[in-house]
Amino acid sequence: APPRPPVTTVAAAAPGTPVPADRRLHWGPPTLAAGVLALAAARPIGDNSFLTHLATGRVLLDRGWPQGNPFLASAPDDFPIPSWWWSGLLAVAEQVAGHAGIRLLTVALAALLGVLVVRLAAGRDGLVASVLPPAVAVLVLLPFVTPRPHLAGFLLLGVALVVRGERRRWWWLIPVFATWVNVHGTWLYGLVVLGLVAGADLLDGPHGRRRSGLRRDAALLGGAVLGVAVGGALYPERFRLVGLPLEQLGGGAAREVIRAYNEWRPVGPASAVFWTLVLLGAAAAGGAVWRRRPGAFLAAVLLCGMGLSAQRLVPVAAISLVPLAASTLDGLGTIPAPSGRAARTLGAVGAVLVALALLAAVRGPHLDHERFPVAAVDRLEARGLVADPDVSVVHQDFVGNYLEWRYGTDAHAYVDDRPDLDTAVDYVDLVRLRPNWERVLERADAQVVLWERDHPLDRALAEAPSWRRVEVVDGFSIWCSEGVSACR
């Protein structure tokens, strides 16, 4: 049997001790990772959720804290506004440099994320341990580096894992989690990840190290929880954000609605990220078996399962698996990590990619509105049938995001990607064309329906005598109910 190497996933140095020169991270591989993610982040912005976050930031800068949701006609007055720090940051970037400023911000954060991902495997011996886990994680992250608030969440997760892996002081996690609570809801999974890796080390560590490791992880978790409390207190409605995950996931109806959104659906084998995440999880689990570390094996399986349970959790799992896989694969194989000329070459390539990403972000085009009904909304605007509080327009969620970006607080949107529960339940009934779809339209007092052509609801409206298709524009049908004079 192979010798059993040290099992701890963190460096053995005391907190605050400088990392030895031979364990420091060469600038080449992290620069390459930064360049790859930066270039992916430089593509024109076509994300629907970003539009609402930017619109929210504009409201925060122009009018201050709004009373309730400022965009949805259906939202209750006490509706919370999550990710408000991120929304404000987007609006500031827009004021400074327009949409180019937002893209530059996205590129910079994506590049920093690439550096952090590679740093999570720093100091491991061999190419397999130091390169394979971060390389696979970067592949997983490619579709997710968009100007949504989850980008800041991924970055803060990386910082939290670096704090633990490099044995930084526990109080570092206070500002990390205080910020995290106000930028993205993945802070809850950050606590879960810290607990999982702490449990793995407790189970696998030699008896003499368990007590000291337990004290350190308890301090880190305490700092994280304290940071959550501080962040919750900074929200204008004290601690509302801390309880928001329970509001969203607490009831059966809420869970059913959430599962209707693509980002909360399980990841299947038809998706490329399924296999890349499975590869990373298998590497971590296989290394744990080789090292006879049941705790690390269990953590790898649980993290991989968490990521596959919902698309939005895939990046969280991938980032979390990097230090675990690097530790279990440490010393495997005879090929050394890149150094010398090879590392310098990787760094040069990465620097070129970063430069190309910055150039693309500045030059444009900045926005990609191909999936949105721009022309159809133009037609509705010409008829006076949109952005009017006296006209109820029912539409799909991503259309609501576009209306909020285009019209701001005058959007009077029916739904977006963060509606209240009652509206979300009704919206799912429309999307799935449940038998009560006509009652849903009645509850919304719908006068106009703007929906994708050939969707089940579009076909159902074609058979409904009280609805008339006015026109089809770029794949979207405009429907009007009886009595709407502007549609005649």
Q: What feature does the model see in each segment?
A:
Residues 37, 137-141, 158-163, 170-185, ...:
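Membrane-interface alpha helices of multi-pass inner-membrane proteins
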Residues 44-45, 49, 61-66, 75, ...:
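Transmembrane catalytic cores of multi-pass membrane glycosyltransferases
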Residues 76-100:
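Short hydrophobic/aromatic helix or loop-helix immediately within or flanking a transmembrane segment
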Residues 104-123:
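Transmembrane-helix motifs of polytopic, lipid-linked glycan transferases
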Residues 116, 137-140, 152-167, 195-198, ...:
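Specific aromatic-rich, kink-prone transmembrane helix
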Residues 338-385, 398-401, 407-410, 419, ...:
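Membrane-proximal, lumen/periplasm-facing interface regions of secretory-pathway glyco-
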Residues 385-424, 442, 446-453, 479:
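Short periplasmic/luminal acceptor-recognition loop of GT-C membrane glycosyltransferases, typified by
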Residues 426-482:
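Periplasmic/luminal catalytic loop of GT-C fold multi-pass membrane glycosyltransferases
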